[in-house]
From Swiss-Prot:
Keywords noted in UniProt: Cytoplasm, Developmental protein, DNA-binding, Nucleus, Transcription, Transcription regulation
UniProt similarity note: Belongs to the TBP family.
InterPro entries, per database record: TBP, TBP-like, TBP_dom_sf
Annotated localization: Cytoplasm; Nucleus
A cellular component annotation (GO) from this entry: nucleus
Gene Ontology molecular function: any one: DNA binding
Organism: Danio rerio
Source domain of life: Eukaryota
Gene that this polypeptide is encoded by: tbpl1
Record's protein name: TATA box-binding protein-like 1
CDD domains per UniProt: TLF
Native organism taxonomy: Eukaryota, Metazoa, Chordata, Craniata, Vertebrata
GO biological process: DNA-templated transcription initiation; embryo development ending in birth or egg hatching; transcription by RNA polymerase II
Pfam families the record matches: TBP
Amino acid sequence: MEPSNDVALDIIVTNVVSVFRTRCHLNLRTIGLEGTNVIYKPEVGKVLMKLRKPRITASIWSSGKIICTGATSEEEAKLGARRLARCLQKMGFKVRFSDFKVVNVLAVCSMPFQIRLIEFTKNNRPIASYEPELHPAASYRIKNLRSTVQVFSTGNITVTGPNVQSVASAVEEIYPLLFECRKTLS
């Protein structure tokens, strides 16, 4: 049986991590006192700020570097980052939204079959590893896409990569390898 080309796999993006700079120094104490939905952590030297729409959490450092997590698309990450910059501007900081980039994307996908992990790692030995004592998934690294795929025996996979395109390409690349190691129903 050949892996059919018309199989539609739903790739669900669950987390997008992005970074941007404000190009100005930020007083964390002021943000902690005046901001809404903030947690000031002076021992770490950062402020956590949460937005409700889009639902993101931002780590704000006094240097002006901000890391946003929790978005479910690259567009939502950019919208949330711009909204965060606007909140800081309203507090009186001379914020300029710059150097925005998506640094990490986490997605999940479910294969329509179960997978024999030991056979999968034996077939793809140099780039696949499986340590059942440490973690229930096999790890498969795709260097040219800078992506890592975690393969579970149930057929569920989690993919981390630098952007949504590389995550989708990683799923396309690994599907034939998983198909040949699928469990047959008895």
